[in-house]
């Protein structure tokens, strides 16, 4: 192996890792210098170690130190030493670091409350970390500071005013609490209906003034709640602490509107059938003798104003609209009445027995002598009536004296009718015409000798006869007319 020239000069930087030979002993002028350098490093490391006598208490650290005679330990020996600080101490005391943080119940709806935090004392804490959760009140009823409730209301009023939300509404701080007074509840549909009514009456200023009045009241109430004085604060707290009134189910609650009437009917009174709006009306219907779910509404479809008892109740004489949703006084199942819900007044049971009809029924047949079934008469019978006068108004017109001659649907009129009615029926003269109607024969009468189910033999063509006499029809030559009766064979 070649001798390292740099080692002989005393400046080989590879040391024992050099791939050339470094001669020992007297060879080379740089060998003694290298050995003396190693001895100097060992002495300096020993002196450095003697500066820290406390390290001798940890004999296990010697395992991390290499022998002094090993020249390999001269590089990076200081980085391999493991020194444990003498002032390190393990604490067995648990410290509640969460005590300095605010608990979950320390915040209100819109503000926060100060929380008194206890500093860590270094002793084991006996405080339950979840005590704040168990003692938290989920509702605002348990708050001792009433100022938070008032602050919440004030902020809600500011948000309501600045957000542009619907102002004709009520306000409640909690859904379990009752509404705060001073606000009215009207939907856009109700205002639109009132505008249509006022426009039809030719008085749109009435609607405009009412809406402006409601808007001014709303703004005034908002300002009072945004900047409440002591009297208003006291009134609010008393109102919130007072028990909620019992709520009646359905639409039985009363509400005073700006248009001067009740918005919805109560259980004892019902609005008339003039309009369904905010108008004031002094006429109300009598209390029903027997309540009925189908007869609770007195609103007429065409604006007529009935005053009558329900349809399934006692017999009370009343004048109702001929076709409306007003309660009629006829009983559907056997009791007597004076007027029908569809314009027919009858003294008979709905589906049985003979009847003496005292007014024109719904389809123009009036009878006083002939027994009638539930549908006005038998098939093919003739109905003769005398001179009767009806007070039932027509659906589309006023009463006119019209002599009518008519028949049943499946019958044939054999005599002229001399019935004079003050109005026509639903199928009568709809536009106040005063004419004499001719007798109309039914679709199927006893005088009709032709049978539409068969075709006479002399009316069939030769091709049709050939097809009917054959065992099966030929494609494209199937007859259109029915066959004659003698061509049918029952097998």
Swiss-Prot record:
GO molecular function, one term: nuclear export signal receptor activity
Keywords: Membrane, Metal-binding, mRNA transport, Nuclear pore complex, Nucleus, Protein transport, Repeat, Translocation, Transport, Zinc, Zinc-finger
One GO term of the biological process aspect: mRNA transport
Top-level taxonomic group: Eukaryota
Disordered: annotated segments: 23-82, 92-111
This protein's domain notes: The FG repeats are interaction sites for karyopherins (importins, exportins) and form probably an affinity gradient, guiding the transport proteins unidirectionally with their cargo through the NPC.
Protein's name in the database: Nucleoporin NUP42
Gene designation: nup42
